[in-house]
C-alpha cells in the first residue's frame, strides 16, 4: 500500500502530506518556494546532525515507518532533527495566519492546533522527541515569517523571470 495507517498517530501525521499537496494545488509560487525551502533546510539539518549528541539529534530507539507516507522501516539510527512533518505543517499554518493578517490570541491558538496535533502524533508514534518537534516548529515558522517579510520582493523576481522567459520564447 502506498500510505500506511496503523494507528491514530499515523492518521494525524498525514496532515503534513495534505499540507504539501495544498502547496502544489494552490499554485501559489511563494508557498511552493517556501515548501521547497523547508524541505531543503530540513534535509540539510538532518544530514549535518547525523551522529551528533544522540539524546537530542538521534531518533528514539525503535523508530519505524516515519517518512511522509508512514513507511520506510526501521530508522532509529538516523537523525530526526528537525521533524519534517512539524516543519511543513508549521510553515503552512503560519503562512496562512500571516496571510490573513488578523493575528490575535484566538487565531494564534486556532492555527497552532494542527501543529500541536502533528507534533504530539510524531512523539507518540516514536519518530521524534520533544526537542526535534520544537525545532521543526521553529523552522517552519521562520521560513513562513521570512517569506512573509520578503513576499513582495519574491513576487517581483518571479515576474521578472516570467517576463524574461516570455521574451526569449517570442
Which residues does each predicted region cover?
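Short, Lys/Arg-enriched charge-dense amphipathic segments
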Residues: 76-84, 131-134, 151-157
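Hydrophobic alpha-helical bundle signature of multipass membrane enzymes
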Residues: 1-81, 86-122
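Interfacial helix-loop-helix junctions of multi-pass membrane proteins
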Residues: 51-60, 117-148
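C-terminal membrane module of polytopic membrane proteins
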Residues: 142-170
Amino acid at each position: 500500500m502506498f500510505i500506511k495507517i496503523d494507528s491514530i498517530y499515523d492518521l494525524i501525521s498525514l496532515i503534513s502530506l495534505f499540507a504539501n499537496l495544498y502547496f502544489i494545488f494552490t499554485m501559489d509560487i511563494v508557498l511552493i518556494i517556501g515548501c521547497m525551502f523547508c524541505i531543503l533546510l530540513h534535509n540539510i539539518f538532518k544530514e549535518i546532525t547525523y551522529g551528533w549528541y544522540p539524546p537530542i539529534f538521534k531518533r528514539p530507539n525503535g523508530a519505524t515507518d516515519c517518512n511522509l507516507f508512514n513507511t520506510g522501516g526501521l530508522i532509529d539510527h538516523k537523525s530526526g532533527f528537525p521533524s519534517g512533518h512539524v516543519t511543513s505543517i508549521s510553515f503552512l499554518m503560519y503562512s496562512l495566519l500571516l496571510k490573513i493578517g488578523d493575528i490575535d490570541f484566538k487565531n494564534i491558538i486556532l492555527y497552532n492546533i494542527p501543529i500541536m496535533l502533528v507534533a504530539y502524533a510524531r512523539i507518540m508514534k516514536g519518530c521524534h522527541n520533544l526537542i526535534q518537534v520544537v525545532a521543526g516548529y521553529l523552522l517552519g515558522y521562520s521560513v513562513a515569517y521570512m517569506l512573509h517579510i520578503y513576499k513582495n520582493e519574491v513576487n517581483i523576481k518571479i515576474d521578472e523571470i516570467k517576463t524574461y522567459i516570455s521574451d526569449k520564447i517570442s
